[in-house]
UniProtKB/Swiss-Prot annotation:
Swiss-Prot/TrEMBL keywords: Cytoplasm, mRNA processing, mRNA splicing, Nucleus, Ribonucleoprotein, RNA-binding, rRNA processing, Spliceosome, tRNA processing
Source organism superkingdom: Eukaryota
Function: Component of LSm protein complexes, which are involved in RNA processing and may function in a chaperone-like manner, facilitating the efficient association of RNA processing factors with their substrates. Component of the cytoplasmic LSM1-LSM7 complex, which is thought to be involved in mRNA degradation by activating the decapping step in the 5'-to-3' mRNA decay pathway. Component of the nuclear LSM2-LSM8 complex, which is involved in splicing of nuclear mRNAs.
GO cellular component: Lsm1-7-Pat1 complex; nucleolus; P-body; sno(s)RNA-containing ribonucleoprotein complex; spliceosomal complex; U4/U6 x U5 tri-snRNP complex; U6 snRNP
Sequence ranges assigned to domain Sm in this UniProt record: 13-85
Location in the cell: Cytoplasm; Nucleus
One annotated GO molecular function: RNA binding
InterPro entries: Lsm6/sSmF (IPR016487), LSM_dom_sf (IPR010920), Sm (IPR047575), Sm_dom_euk/arc (IPR001163)
Keyword RNA-binding: yes
Name listed for the protein in its UniProt record: U6 snRNA-associated Sm-like protein LSm6
Complex and partners: Component of the heptameric LSM1-LSM7 complex, which consists of lsm1, lsm2, lsm3, lsm4, lsm5, lsm6 and lsm7. Component of the heptameric LSM2-LSM8 complex, which consists of lsm2, lsm3, lsm4, lsm5, lsm6, lsm7 and lsm8. The LSm subunits form a seven-membered ring structure with a doughnut shape.
Species for this entry: Botryotinia fuckeliana (strain B05.10) (Noble rot fungus)
Keyword Lipoprotein among UniProt keywords: no
Example GO BP: mRNA splicing, via spliceosome
Amino acid sequence: MENGALQQGEGKDPSSFLSEIIGSKVIVKLNNSLVFKGELQSVDGYMNIALEKCEEWVHGKKKTVHGDAFVRGNNVMYISADESA
C-alpha cells in the first residue's frame, strides 16, 4: 500500500462485495470443480446462492443451460465477478 492508496479489493469484507454484485454476472466454482456462470440474484449468510440465466460448465466447456439454479453454500469454493460479461 503505497501513499495510503487502497489496492483493488482491499478494505472490503466479502458480504459487502457480494451485495454490490447482486444483479451482475458471476462465476461460481464448486468444491467438485463444476462451474456455474449466471446472474447473481441472492446470497445469504450461509453462501447459499440463487442464479438466473445460469450455465453449467465442465472442464471449460458449456454443458447445460439452466434457467434458475440454487447452490447450497457448503458446496461453494468461490464466487467471482464475471469480467468477460
